[in-house]
């Protein structure tokens, strides 16, 4: 079972896996642990990751990047419209109103959804993990920003389904970092002590996030989160790009924004300059050759100028920090440490701002790039039964308050209830009780739309169906379980109706029914039961309302009854009571049955099953096309490699092993094949390259074999000669009556001599025949035949010459007629020669009175 953590970022991705030795971040086929979030489309296949990044400038229109923030958003979203202006590829609306990405693929115009694009990236990450683990990858944990809304999270899950990944949990970035930070710490307080407060701050390419966490041994709880979704390292790059665009326009009369390729090159150079300024405070140059119109451009900047240019962005860093302190009611001294991760935290000014706010130095104990992926892998290992991990519970926080609105039964007024407040523990479930006579709707929405970085506050509409009134006409009690699950997604998981069914029982049972009925009747004064059930099982606590319900359903005996009536009467009094009192009529007992109700969900964003299946089928076809194209390219490269290899060696080591006529013929074939490769064979089917390779190998293989045989044959013949000399010497020693071999039977040694003579004669004949042949002729014997002879010789001779000598038994010691041999120590211990027991010695085993054995140890 695979345990994989995927950090899918807007600019790059990291993969962490769990092994027996711990968590490891794995590398891709380029030996790089960072895989760019870039996908390039070509006429034959897709290119994903490093290879796509390398051709981003040359294939700008068909190379897709920075698409993570498009999840779950409509094309009309203001954020999409703003981002559209700075992209090198086209965004168009989909039929469902979502964002579509238009590219040229397989020489045709294709429209892909954001889920499909992310699925393509996940396909690459999955392939990299499988190549590293050498087994299929299915289960994983994927990271998302903590400010992702319900629609965005559902969109990411759909992308994982397209590629066949079972996402065990969508984990918030900072929660993953906190898990990676806390699980290895040994100085955490015990569970019953005051938790240790720590802050986790992440500043990546596209956003700034910070979380306050409480740590105990084996426990992590996120107290609150704050963020700026539009403050990332990319914004600092944009400031540099704007500055140099203005400078080049004034200095060189060049408008970099008019050409997308020039703008992309400037973006790359500005990113490099920003990284250099993080470690150097002096003036640093920016040089780009042939920038536009065959003109070279140059400029320079230092760190102080950069900080002055980005002063507005640096001021925004403190806003989420202040917000976090207000939400959690913490003081800066309550935060014992602040761990920072993300590429943008390497900017010295960013570190200084964070350290100044908290009044302490920031901590950089974690790998700033890989911390999120490692935290996701740890969470996956905790959830997986295949790994035994230290117990560590993770309680996340709901980033936005969620409310429910519904119509009352009269349909004249609406009821609103905030079911999950900001920073409420998650995953978490609550049970709401409604009194209804028919089906009703619940609408979930974010209570604070201004604080949500998403234009739509609505989450979805849920219809509870098959609700009916009780048989007596009263309203039915409907229990609705609302939940924020492990992915941070709001849902109505179940709904049930409490139905009363009258049954007839004996007198004792009817008394029990009378006791239960009042407590089971829902309160008419409140439409929603304020004592709603809260299921904290996933957060580590026990459900409370189940206990409360048990206490209310079983009423205690009334204290007004005299104590004698609580006693069990004797048989005579019971018989008298039966005779005196007339039989009472049977009272109906109310039996309570919970009926499960279907819930229809109409969500703001969720791919339909048919559309999802179509995307899965499309992705499968593209994966197969990529595989076929890779095999075709491999076959083509094999032909090209063969041409270059034989051409170089025919004028070198292979020259002696081919005749002049064949040499000229083979060279002509190599030249013709090379010309064919770059002309007619530039784009051929896989089989055409296989046929060409077979044609080349038909002429080249014999030459290659002759060369290899000439290199290996002397070594193998020398080995055979050494074995023959070894066995011949042993036979000679046997004939000279050497004591070492006098135990070997005469007939056995004759077999050795016969085998040695036969193999020696064969070797002499082969060597004489080979000496008469030239190097450009096929050899008389192959090296594998000589090795077979060596093996055959060893099989015959080794069992004979390695026969062990029989062991010679030493003569038994003679005992003196007068008693034991006093020269031998063992005769003085244990029993003597006549069977008498020796006296007990210290350190010996001897039976005690009960017959058991006592061990006296020195």
Curated annotation (Swiss-Prot):
Residues 564-585, 806-815, 822-834 have a biased composition (Basic and acidic residues). The modification N6-acetyllysine is found at residue 471. Residues 500-585, 801-858 are annotated as: Disordered. Phosphorylation on Ser-509 may be important for regulation of the HSPA8/HSC70 chaperone activity. Predominantly expressed in the brain and also found in the liver. This is Heat shock protein 105 kDa. Acts as a nucleotide-exchange factor (NEF) for chaperone proteins HSPA1A and HSPA1B, promoting the release of ADP from HSPA1A/B thereby triggering substrate release. Prevents the aggregation of denatured proteins in cells under severe stress, on which the ATP levels decrease markedly. Inhibits HSPA8/HSC70 ATPase and chaperone activities. Keywords: Acetylation, ATP-binding, Cytoplasm, Nucleotide-binding, Phosphoprotein, Stress response. The lineage of its organism: Eukaryota, Metazoa, Chordata, Craniata, Vertebrata. PANTHER family: HEAT SHOCK PROTEIN 105 KDA, HSC70CB, ISOFORM G-RELATED. The keyword Phosphoprotein applies. One of its GO terms (biological process) is cellular response to heat. The modification N-acetylserine is found at residue 2. Belongs to the heat shock protein 70 family. GO terms for cellular component: cytosol; nucleus. The modification Phosphothreonine is found at residue 816. Transmembrane segments: none annotated.
């Amino acid at each position: 079972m695979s345990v994989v953590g995927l950090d899918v970022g807007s600019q790059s991705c990291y993969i962490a896996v769990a092994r027996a030795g711990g968590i490891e971040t794995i590398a891709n086929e380029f030996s790089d642990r960072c895989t760019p979030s870039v996908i390039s489309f070509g006429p034959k296949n897709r290119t994903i990751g490093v290879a796509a990044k390398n051709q981003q400038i040359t294939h700008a229109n068909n190379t897709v990047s920075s698409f993570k923030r498009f999840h779950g958003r409509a094309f009309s979203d203001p954020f999409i419209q703003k981002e559209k202006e700075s992209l090198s590829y086209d965004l168009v609306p989909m039929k469902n109103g979502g964002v579509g990405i238009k590219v040229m693929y397989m020489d045709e115009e294709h429209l892909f959804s954001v889920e499909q694009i992310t699925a393509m990236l996940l396909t690459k990450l999955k392939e990299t993990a499988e190549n590293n683990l050498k087994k299929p990858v299915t289960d994983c944990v994927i990271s998302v920003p903590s400010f992702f809304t319900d629609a965005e999270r559902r969109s990411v899950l759909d992308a994982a389904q397209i590629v066949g990944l079972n996402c065990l949990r969508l984990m918030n970035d900072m929660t993953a970092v906190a898990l990676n930070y806390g699980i290895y710490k040994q100085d955490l307080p015990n569970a019953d002590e005051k938790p240790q407060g720590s802050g986790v701050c992440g500043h990546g390419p596209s956003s700034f996030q910070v979380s306050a966490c409480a740590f105990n041994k084996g426990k992590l709880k996120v107290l609150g989160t704050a963020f700026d979704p539009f403050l990332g390292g990319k914004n600092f790059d944009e400031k540099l790009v704007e500055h140099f665009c203005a400078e080049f326009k004034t200095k060189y009369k060049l408008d970099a924004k008019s050409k997308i390729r020039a703008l992309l090159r400037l973006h790359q150079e500005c990113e490099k300059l920003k990284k250099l300024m993080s470690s150097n405070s002096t003036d640093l140059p920016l040089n780009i050759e042939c920038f536009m119109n065959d003109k070279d451009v140059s400029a320079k900047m230092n760190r102080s100028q950069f900080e002055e240019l980005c002063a507005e962005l640096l001021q925004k860093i403190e806003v989420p920090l202040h917000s976090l302190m207000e939400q959690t009611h913490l003081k800066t001294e309550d935060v014992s440490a602040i761990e920072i991760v993300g590429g943008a935290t390497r900017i010295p000014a960013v570190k200084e701002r964070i350290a100044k706010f908290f009044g302490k130095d920031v901590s950089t104990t974690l790998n700033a790039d890989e911390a999120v992926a490692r935290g996701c892998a740890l969470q996956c290992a905790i959830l997986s039964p295949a790994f035994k991990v230290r117990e560590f519970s993770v309680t996340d926080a709901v980033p936005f308050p969620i409310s429910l609105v519904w119509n009352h039964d009269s349909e004249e007024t609406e009821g609103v209830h905030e079911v999950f407040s900001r920073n409420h523990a998650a995953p978490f479930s609550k049970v709401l009780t409604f009194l209804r006579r028919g089906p009703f709707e619940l609408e979930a929405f974010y209570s604070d739309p201004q604080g949500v970085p998403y234009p739509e506050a609505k989450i979805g509409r849920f219809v509870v169906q098959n609700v009916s009134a009780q048989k007596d006409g009263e309203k039915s009690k409907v229990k609705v379980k609302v939940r924020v699950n492990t992915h941070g997604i709001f849902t109505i998981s179940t709904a049930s109706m409490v139905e009363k069914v009258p049954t007839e029982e004996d007198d004792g049972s009817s008394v029990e029914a009378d006791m239960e009925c009042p407590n089971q009747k829902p309160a008419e004064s409140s439409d929603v039961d304020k004592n709603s059930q809260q299921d904290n099982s996933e957060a580590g606590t026990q459900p409370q309302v189940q206990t409360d319900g048990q206490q209310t359903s079983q009423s205690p005996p009334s204290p007004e009854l005299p104590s004698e009536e609580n006693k069990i009467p004797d048989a005579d009094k019971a018989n008298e009571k039966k005779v005196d009192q007339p039989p009472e009529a049977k009272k109906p007992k109310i039996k309570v049955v919970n009926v499960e109700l279907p819930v229809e969900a109409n969500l703001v964003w969720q791919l339909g099953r048919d559309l999802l299946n179509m995307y899965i089928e499309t992705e499968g076809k593209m994966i197969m096309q990529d595989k076929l194209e890779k095999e075709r390219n491999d076959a083509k490269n094999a032909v090209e490699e063969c041409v270059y290899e034989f051409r170089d060696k025919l004028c070198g080591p292979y020259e002696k092993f081919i005749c002049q006529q064949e040499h000229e013929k083979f060279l002509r074939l190599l030249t013709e094949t090379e010309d064919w490769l770059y002309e007619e064979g530039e784009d051929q089917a896989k089989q055409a390259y296989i046929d060409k390779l077979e044609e080349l190998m038909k002429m080249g293989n014999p030459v290659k074999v002759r060369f290899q045989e000439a290199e290996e044959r002397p070594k193998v013949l020398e080995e055979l000669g050494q074995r023959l000399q070894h066995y011949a010497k042993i036979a000679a020693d046997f004939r000279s009556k050497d004591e070492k071999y006098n135990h070997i039977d005469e007939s056995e040694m004759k077999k050795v001599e016969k085998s040695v003579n036969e193999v020696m004669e064969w070797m002499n004949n082969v060597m004489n025949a080979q000496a008469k042949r030239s190097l450009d002729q096929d050899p008389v014997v192959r090296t594998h035949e000589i090795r077979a002879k060596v093996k055959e010789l060893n099989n015959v001779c080794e069992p004979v010459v390695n026969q062990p000598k029989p062991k010679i038994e030493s003569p038994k010691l003679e005992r003196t007629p007068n008693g034991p041999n006093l020269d031998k120590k063992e005769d003085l211990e244990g029993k003597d020669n006549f069977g008498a027991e020796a006296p007990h010695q210290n350190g010996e085993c001897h039976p005690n009175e009960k017959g058991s054995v006592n061990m006296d140890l020195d």
